[in-house]
């Protein structure tokens, strides 16, 4: 099968679409990737790519074709320019780079922005190939939830764009079943929607058992009960509520909060830690490669996932949930809806309502006071549930089957 994968983000940027490409290639399919130049998350072109672009033209047996784009940089205007520059160059150069090639199917990984799908719509008609779209963020809902767009007129325009894109897709894969109503509202074709959740990355196949040493960065925290947050530090993660919980437990000397990651609101979080005088219990450890996350998780008493109290966020399962489950550590959830349901259904930890700093503090105290055997049992249930519900091999086999079925219908 000849598959074109289109994604604004791709290796060496860390996204699960990388594993889709490597697995399809390993299963004998001819995969071509059309993507941009790597600049996420720092917003600057990767130095290694800048020095030797040719070294990034092949990945796991797949050919990688890259188009220019404006790096994300800092600030809203540069982000908008980044989004639209990919649309422009992928639409302009994509057909030229792919001239003379035919494909059995086109697969698009659509984390934000939804605009990145537009070149695929064009290529679908040029190549006469079916288009499969993996929806990881719901637009326009996400834009209003994080406060990026407040104008109803502009949100309605984005909604029309989303409807246009969905109607040109042959199959729409939703990362959460909670996405179905919104997708079907804009597509007006419920028969096209399928459930395709995220999974734990291959880096977590090693587990975090006793034979795995903790990260060296945790040596000063090894005798404490550590609440660890790992991932993007953004508006959606509601760090004011997390710091509210930390402030409520500021006098609990055995409890520490470790933040592993970076993001657009990281400077504001650092300032808040200083302002609230939480430097003795809240520590920002910076961003580290995904490959090192198991050794960081090894030193965690519990792994924290949070989302703001917005209706749209109650529909999503944050990608870190699957990684946390695979780590075999208790989970702490300060979120509503689908993400909370997974934790409760798995018996993998404790949850409180989104935005509830007091509730999170209470959950932390409950976990800290539990016996280690009880917490270990939570971790085992987490791993078992993750393997049952989010098995990587099964899910990648499913997307392969959908691509093959779509190709036969053309």
Name what the model sees in each region.
Residues 37, 178, 198-199:
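Carbohydrate-associated surface elements
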Residues 355, 359, 372-403:
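A charged, aromatic-enriched C-terminal amphipathic alpha-helix characteristic of glycosyltransferases
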Residues 115, 122-126, 152-172:
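Membrane-proximal helix-turn-helix segments that form the acceptor-binding/catalytic region
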Residues 1-60:
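N-terminal subdomain of nucleotide-sugar transferases
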Residues 253, 258-260, 267-294:
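Nucleotide-activated donor-binding/catalytic signature segment of Leloir-type glycosyltransferases, i.e.
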Residues 170, 281, 297-314, 329:
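Acidic donor-binding loop of glycosyltransferase active sites
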Residues 200, 215-237, 243-246, 258:
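Conserved donor-binding/catalytic core segment of Leloir-type glycosyltransferases
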């Amino acid at each position: 099968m000849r598959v074109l994968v289109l994604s604004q983000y791709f290796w060496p940027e860390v996204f699960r679409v990388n594993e889709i490409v490597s697995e399809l290639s390993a299963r004998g399919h001819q995969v071509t990737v059309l993507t941009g130049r790597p600049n996420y998350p720092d917003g600057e072109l990767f130095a290694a790519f800048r020095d030797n672009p040719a070294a990034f033209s092949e990945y796991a047996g797949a050919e990688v074709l890259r188009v220019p784009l404006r790096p994300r940089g800092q600030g809203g205007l540069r982000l908008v320019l980044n989004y639209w520059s990919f649309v422009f160059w992928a639409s302009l150069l994509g057909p030229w780079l792919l001239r003379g090639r035919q494909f059995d199917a086109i697969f698009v990984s659509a984390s934000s922005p939804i605009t990145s799908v537009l070149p695929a719509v064009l290529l679908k008609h040029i190549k006469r190939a079916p288009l499969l779209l993996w929806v990881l963020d719901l637009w326009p809902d996400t834009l209003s939830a994080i406060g990026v767009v407040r104008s109803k007129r502009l949100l309605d325009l984005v909604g029309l764009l989303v409807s246009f894109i969905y109607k040109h897709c042959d199959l729409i894969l939703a990362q959460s079943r909670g996405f179905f109503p919104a997708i079907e509202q804009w597509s007006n074709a419920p028969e096209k929607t399928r459930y395709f959740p995220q999974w734990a990355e291959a880096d977590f196949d090693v587990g975090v058992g006793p034979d795995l040493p903790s990260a060296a960065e945790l040596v000063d925290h090894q005798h404490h009960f550590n609440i660890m947050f790992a991932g993007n530090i953004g508006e959606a993660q509601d760090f004011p509520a997390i710091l509210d919980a930390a402030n409520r437990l500021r006098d609990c000397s055995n409890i520490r909060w470790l933040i592993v990651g970076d993001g657009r609101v990281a400077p504001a979080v650092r300032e808040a830690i200083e302002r609230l005088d939480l430097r003795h219990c809240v520590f920002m450890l910076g961003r580290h490669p995904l490959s090192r996350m198991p050794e960081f998780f090894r030193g965690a008493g519990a792994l924290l996932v949070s989302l703001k109290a917005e209706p749209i966020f109650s529909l999503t399962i944050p990608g870190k949930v699957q990684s946390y489950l695979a780590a075999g550590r208790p989970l702490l959830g300060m979120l509503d809806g689908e993400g909370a349901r997974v934790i409760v259904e798995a018996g993998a930890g404790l949850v409180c309502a989104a935005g509830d700093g007091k509730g999170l503090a209470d959950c932390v105290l409950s976990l800290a006071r539990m016996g280690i055997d009880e917490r270990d049992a939570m971790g085992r249930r987490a791993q078992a549930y993750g393997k049952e519900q989010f098995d990587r091999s099964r899910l990648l086999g499913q997307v392969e089957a959908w691509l093959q079925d779509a190709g036969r219908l053309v």
